[in-house]
């Protein structure tokens, strides 16, 4: 049981393995043939925004992707950068590379799962299961499934997930403001000093 909880929640949390509470998939192992439009193709470098300027054909998507990311699923990096997660928030078709793991769960709130992946205990478990001798380093899909997470009731998951989603939104907003201020400062420095 965590030391900090929202009021009204007293039930015990249950330790479960990720593969007990979620189906886990990885993306295509084939290097795709990119084109100017079609189905957006995601890789490790796209995890923060889940947007990309790489696309594959609709035909390649239909052939390669039987299991597809959908709204409410979670994608996590598993090759190179490991353990960075994001929630799919679009209804558009998305294709994804082998470097990403896809979580589909009926039991977990997606924002709770994302926050859980970032929890120090889970990051430590992911790190322990990572093949550090590989280049780039990676964690196999089966090893991801063995990672334990602590799971409360769905109501508490939803409350926690909403809390962390709001925090992330606030951080993003302030980051944009900070970036804008830095650009303004740069402009002032260029114009005020000759």
Give the role of each language-model region.
Residues 1-11, 176-194:
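Short amphipathic coiled-coil heptad-repeat segments
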Residues 2, 156-170, 174-175:
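Extracellular/lumenal glycan-associated surfaces
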Residues 5-28:
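Non-catalytic DNA-recognition/assembly elements of restriction-modification systems
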Residues 22, 30-60:
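DNA target-recognition patches
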Residues 29, 94-100, 132-155:
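A short glycine-rich beta-alpha junction/loop motif
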Residues 43-44, 54, 61-122:
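A short beta-sheet element
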């Amino acid at each position: 049981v965590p030391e900090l909880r929202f009021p009204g929640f007293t039930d015990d949390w249950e330790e479960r393995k990720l593969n007990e509470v979620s189906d886990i998939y990885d993306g295509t192992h084939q290097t795709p043939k990119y084109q100017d439009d079609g189905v957006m193709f995601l890789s490790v470098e796209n995890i923060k925004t889940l947007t990309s300027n790489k696309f594959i054909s609709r035909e390649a998507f239909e052939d390669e992707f039987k299991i597809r990311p959908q709204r409410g699923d979670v994608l996590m990096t598993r090759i190179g950068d490991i353990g960075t997660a994001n929630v799919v928030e679009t209804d558009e078709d998305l294709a994804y590379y082998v470097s990403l793991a896809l979580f589909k769960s009926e039991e977990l709130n997606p924002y709770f799962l994302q926050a859980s992946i970032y929890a120090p205990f889970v990051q430590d478990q992911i790190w322990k299961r990572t093949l550090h001798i590989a280049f780039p380093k990676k964690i196999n899909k089966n090893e991801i499934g063995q990672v334990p997470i602590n799971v409360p009731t769905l109501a508490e998951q939803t409350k926690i997930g909403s809390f962390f989603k709001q925090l992330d939104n606030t951080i993003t907003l302030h980051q944009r403001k900070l970036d804008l201020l830095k650009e303004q400062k740069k402009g002032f420095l260029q114009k005020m000093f000759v």
